[in-house]
């Protein structure tokens, strides 16, 4: 289970540094936005709900791509929203500070979009069912999240450190994330057209501690209530093994496994004339 109070505190603290360190999250965002550009014209008068807007990176681009859209952007970290409100041309955006899993919606949306956020939900399936109900006819729920191969080098180094220290107890580092197949199953909402794709991004750092700093600066450190590593000696062993086993050409590597989901609702679209004929491409990145 994710400790939402702790997570909120960390994201509030990271609001000022998030954009500087969120390299992978921005790559994921650009992929989502490219899919919307293929589906809707610039003139489209669509209703958009953005979940987990953070510092407003996607929000600002949505305003530029779809100037006639009505946009609502939600995040549960007040400091993130404060940064988002400082972006250009977002005066007409409705910002709300709320937890996605406690969200009460009254409207219907042509687009519900979320980037690198749903891994923080404690019950993704329940949230997807609720969100799907608030899609307009032929509306789309488009989101990215992190998959199970994220930080695979870190997890391998941690397991090798446990073996070295002869630790048998079940302790982990980081949270459990979905495989592509698991996410596909979770997204299989009745009467919804579902497509899930995946890709991996490899980031490079001078030292492991630089990698950890990048995680901390985007607020993504472990907020799981399950048992996790608290042993300084085990942590030091993991750092040493990471640098020993996962250094290439003088830099350590870190894998980010990105999953992209597209769920389309059946029914007649509200404003067919303002959409492009092309559909979302169902190809892997």
UniProtKB/Swiss-Prot annotation:
Pathway: Cofactor biosynthesis; biotin biosynthesis. Its EC number is 2.1.1.197. Keywords: Biotin biosynthesis, Methyltransferase, S-adenosyl-L-methionine, Transferase. The keyword Transferase applies. The keyword S-adenosyl-L-methionine applies. InterPro entries: BioC (IPR011814), Methyltranfer_dom (IPR025714), SAM-dependent_MTases_sf (IPR029063). GO terms for biological process: biotin biosynthetic process; methylation. Converts the free carboxyl group of a malonyl-thioester to its methyl ester by transfer of a methyl group from S-adenosyl-L-methionine (SAM). It allows to synthesize pimeloyl-ACP via the fatty acid synthetic pathway. Belongs to the methyltransferase superfamily. This is Malonyl-[acyl-carrier protein] O-methyltransferase. It comes from Bacillus cytotoxicus (strain DSM 22905 / CIP 110041 / 391-98 / NVH 391-98).
């Amino acid at each position: 289970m994710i400790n939402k109070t702790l997570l909120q505190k960390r994201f509030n603290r990271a609001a000022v540094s998030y954009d500087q360190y969120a390299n992978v999250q921005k790559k994921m965002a650009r992929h989502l936005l490219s899919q919307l550009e293929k589906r809707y014209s610039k003139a489209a008068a669509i209703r958009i709900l953005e979940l987990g807007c953070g510092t407003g990176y996607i929000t600002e681009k949505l305003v530029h791509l779809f100037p006639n859209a009505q946009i609502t952007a939600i995040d549960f970290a007040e400091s993130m929203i404060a940064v988002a409100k400082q972006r250009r041309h977002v005066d007409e955006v409705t910002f709300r500070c709320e937890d996605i899993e406690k969200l009460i919606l009254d409207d219907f949306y042509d687009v519900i979009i979320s980037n690198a956020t749903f891994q923080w939900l404690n019950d993704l399936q329940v949230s997807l069912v609720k969100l799907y109900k608030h899609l307009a006819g032929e509306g789309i729920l488009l989101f990215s999240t992190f998959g199970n191969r994220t930080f695979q080098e870190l997890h391998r180094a941690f397991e090798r450190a446990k073996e070295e220290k002869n630790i048998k107890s079940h302790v982990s580092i980081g949270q459990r994330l979905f495989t592509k197949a698991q996410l596909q199953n979770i997204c299989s909402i009745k009467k919804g057209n579902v497509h899930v794709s995946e890709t991996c991004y490899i980031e490079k750092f001078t030292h492991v501690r630089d990698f950890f700093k990048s995680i901390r600066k985007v607020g993504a450190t472990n907020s799981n209530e399950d048992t996790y590593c608290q042993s300084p000696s085990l942590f030091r062993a993991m750092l040493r093994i990471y640098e020993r086993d996962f250094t290439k050409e003088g830099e350590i590597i870190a894998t980010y496994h990105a999953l992209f989901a597209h769920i389309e609702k059946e029914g007649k679209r509200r404003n067919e004339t303002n959409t492009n004929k092309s559909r979302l491409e169902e190809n892997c990145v």
